[in-house]
Design a protein with these regions (language model features):
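Conserved class I S-adenosyl-L-methionine
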Residues: 42-52
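Conserved SAM-binding loop of SAM-dependent methyltransferases across substrates and taxa
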Residues: 53-66
Length: 198
């Protein structure tokens, strides 16, 4: 067994996620942020960008209940979650007409993105790829997020964080940084929240 496998199996959040039936440990990141920072109503409409394998979508289903309006999008196929509309498509290639099928869900109350590029280790390249994903998320925000809506975006500390923070300050009344406990301490990831769309 590799060192990586040992670390993963020994990770408490990974064990908790498996025991609770979540598809990924990332479920606990969203749970913490929703409980502390983002208050959702049962009637909220939410889009989960980069949803595979579905951990965040599962948490949304828990928080929103049966009469849910959840849209999940990912380039990879995702096992069905009851009450969720799933579109298999690259976020970069999203078009306005892709939202026709869920027009009754619009506008969204919350846009989520847990997306990250495949890391090369080349800082400039990785940041550029991350910013491309952030721009795709911001496009959804600009077109489909309702007045006073919120956004949650995963970024890397450094250039992509600075870029996203500046972009959100132009769009939202409140901008905040979050590092959930389930995010590995040595990870460069951090989450940025925009609340109350102007």
């Amino acid at each position: 067994m590799s060192h990586k496998s040992n670390y993963r199996d020994g990770d408490s959040f990974t064990k908790q996620a498996k025991k609770a039936g979540y598809r990924s440990r990332a479920a606990y990141k969203l749970k913490e942020i929703l409980e502390k920072e983002l208050k959702l109503k049962r009637s909220s409409s939410v889009i989960d960008l980069g949803s595979f394998p579905g951990g965040w979508t599962q948490v949304l289903r828990e928080f929103l209940g049966n009469k849910t309006k959840i849209t999940a999008i990912d380039i990879q196929p995702m096992k069905k979650i009851e009450g969720c509309f799933f579109l298999q498509k690259s976020i970069i290639d999203l078009k306005d007409e892709d939202f026709e099928e869920i027009k009754e869900f619009l506008p969204f109350d919350l846009v989520l993105s847990d997306m990250a590029p495949n890391i090369s280790g080349i800082k400039e390249r990785d940041n550029a790829l991350m910013i491309n994903l952030i721009d795709s998320t911001l496009s959804v925000v600009d077109k489909f997020l309702g007045k006073k809506g919120s956004v949650l975006i995963k970024v890397f500390q450094g250039e992509s964080l600075d870029y996203t923070r500046a972009a959100l300050k132009k769009r939202f009344d409140k901008v905040k940084i979050s590092k959930p406990k389930a995010s590995r301490p040595n990870s460069n990831e951090i989450y940025i929240i925009g609340k109350e769309l102007k």
